[in-house]
């Protein structure tokens, strides 16, 4: 109350200055008191509403901030910065379509704002506005180069994989790669996108180029081996897995991958041994490993052990194990 009484003695400009300085210090309550006075003194001044809205954003009172920004825009629809501020408030309250409209309005006036392009790229991904996403992704790469891929590439890949749109993403990254064919970051991102889009043949073509310069990259070798496996080029896949195991002989997932190759080659004893090592080392897909080991043991004439493995596989969620149980383990 005391500050409110004193504040009334100051000019509009002084109240605004007090409010902004208090905001900078993190003293939001004092800032609001001062800016309330400024709004009351000159309610037709949009900047007072904008400034109070910004303080409310800092206070995480986003709903009240939107009210202030709405009033400011009503008073002065030509102050571009207000749309960016309201975008932030809308985004935080999950009013994504309104936020999208505001960030588009802002970038229509301030086209070179890198922060705003990053924000819109992220939001357009959330809204599956892929044309806008592409526009911002390409623009940002032209400005910040490989940092765009390194910072946001994994997030983008996860989004498209989750939404089963990997072919769309592969197409977008492919277009970017055509523009910047010398970029290793784009090429590696394109490899990942093609792999997740199940476009294994072109993925292998790019892997050949990348591995010639970077032969010891474990992630690239894994993509290569997996792509060969999915193309049913089992012997080639097995050779790559075997080579990788020389450097990481206890890698549970590599052991599982190699074991499944041995299974496809009908090397039952070796597959049994390899998958047993993988299960013992706790691979990330135990249900599939138990299924495979059960098949290897069945083909060695070890039906009892095979049935135990298939039962375990089915319990862990591998539906394909049910077929083997029904066909060979009816007593189970």
Regions found by a protein language model. Name each.
Residues 11-13, 46-47, 80-81, 114-115, ...:
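Helix-start (N-cap) detector for alpha-helical repeat units in TPR-like alpha-solenoids
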Residues 17, 51, 85, 119, ...:
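Canonical tetratricopeptide repeat
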Residues 24-25, 58, 92, 126-129, ...:
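Register position in tetratricopeptide repeats
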Residues 37-38, 71-72, 105-106, 139-140, ...:
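Canonical positions in the second alpha-helix
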Residues 43, 77, 111, 144-147, ...:
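Short coil turns that delineate tetratricopeptide repeat
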């Amino acid at each position: 109350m005391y500050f409110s009484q004193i504040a009334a003695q100051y000019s509009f400009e002084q109240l605004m200055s007090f409010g902004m300085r208090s905001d900078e210090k993190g003293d939001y309550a004092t800032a609001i008191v001062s800016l309330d006075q400024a709004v009351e003194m000159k309610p037709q001044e949009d900047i007072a509403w904008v400034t109070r809205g910004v303080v409310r954003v800092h206070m995480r009172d986003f709903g009240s901030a939107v009210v202030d920004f709405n009033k400011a825009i009503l008073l002065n629809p030509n102050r571009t910065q207000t749309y960016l501020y309201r975008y932030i408030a809308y985004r935080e309250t999950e009013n994504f379509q309104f936020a999208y409209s505001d960030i588009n309005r802002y970038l229509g006036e301030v086209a070179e704002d890198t922060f705003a392009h990053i924000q819109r790229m992220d939001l357009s991904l959330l809204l599956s506005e892929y044309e806008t996403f592409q526009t911002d992704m390409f623009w940002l790469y032209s400005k910040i180069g490989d940092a765009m891929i390194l910072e946001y590439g994994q997030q983008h890949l996860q989004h498209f994989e989750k939404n089963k749109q990997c072919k769309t993403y592969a197409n977008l990254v492919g277009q970017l790669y055509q523009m910047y064919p010398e970029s290793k970051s784009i090429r590696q991102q394109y490899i990942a996108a093609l792999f997740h889009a199940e476009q294994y043949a072109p993925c292998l073509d790019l892997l050949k180029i990348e591995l010639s310069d970077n032969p010891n990259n474990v992630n690239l070798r894994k993509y290569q081996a997996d792509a060969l496996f999915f193309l049913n080029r089992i012997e080639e896949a097995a050779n790559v897995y075997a080579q990788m195991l020389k450097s990481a002989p206890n890698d549970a997932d590599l052991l599982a991958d190699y074991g499944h190759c041995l299974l496809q080659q009908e090397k039952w004893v070796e597959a049994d041994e390899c998958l047993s090592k993988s299960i013992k080392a706790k691979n990330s897909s135990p249900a599939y490993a138990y299924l495979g080991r059960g098949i290897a043991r069945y083909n060695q004439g070890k039906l009892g052990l095979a049935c135990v493995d298939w039962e375990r596989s089915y319990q862990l969620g591998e539906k394909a194990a049910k077929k083997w149980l029904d066909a060979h383990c009816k007593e189970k």
